[in-house]
Amino acid sequence: MLKVSKSPSLVRLKTRGESVCPISKTVDSFEVSVEYIPRGAVLAIEEFKKMVDSYRGREILHEELAVDLLEKVKAAVNPPYVKVTVKSYYIGVEVEVVAESGGVPPVYI
């Protein structure tokens, strides 16, 4: 966590990661996006990457991963709003899981 004297309106972080499907036991590659409204502190990029890398080799469904990552971000920076989106493809089907917490953020156009 990094303390900031001036908070931006919204922070959006994106990266890729891997986990293991608990059903098929195959490697699941995913793209993850985290959006949050900071409240005096922001998540260090290295800390975010470490959070995502913690799923490598771990058996977890994407639905659980999205909620787990949301809880980690909330614990780290206590944002009033956070949204985690996990995207992947499995047997030709695009899977997108969203976990949100807090009030509705302002609309960005």
Swiss-Prot record:
Gene3D superfamilies: 3.30.1130.10. Coiled coil: none annotated. SUPFAM superfamilies: Tetrahydrobiopterin biosynthesis enzymes-like. Is responsible for the final step in the biosynthesis of archaeosine, a modified nucleoside present in the dihydrouridine loop (D-loop) of archaeal tRNA. Catalyzes the conversion of 7-cyano-7-deazaguanine (preQ0)-modified tRNA to archaeosine-tRNA, transforming a nitrile group to a formamidine group. Can use neither glutamine nor asparagine as amino donor in vitro, is only able to utilize free ammonium. However, the enzyme might function in vivo with a partner that serves to generate ammonium. The active site is at C21 (thioimide intermediate), D28 (proton donor/acceptor). This is Archaeosine synthase. It is an enzyme of class 2 (transferase). It comes from the Archaea. Keywords: Transferase, tRNA processing. Its EC number is 2.6.1.-. Substrate binds at D28, L43, A44, I45, E46, H62, E63. Pfam families: QueF (PF14489). It catalyses: 7-cyano-7-carbaguanosine(15) in tRNA + NH4(+) = archaeosine(15) in tRNA. Forms a symmetric tunnel-fold (T-fold) homodecamer of two head-to-head facing pentameric subunits, with 10 active sites at the intermonomer interfaces. Transmembrane segments: none annotated. The gene is queF-L.
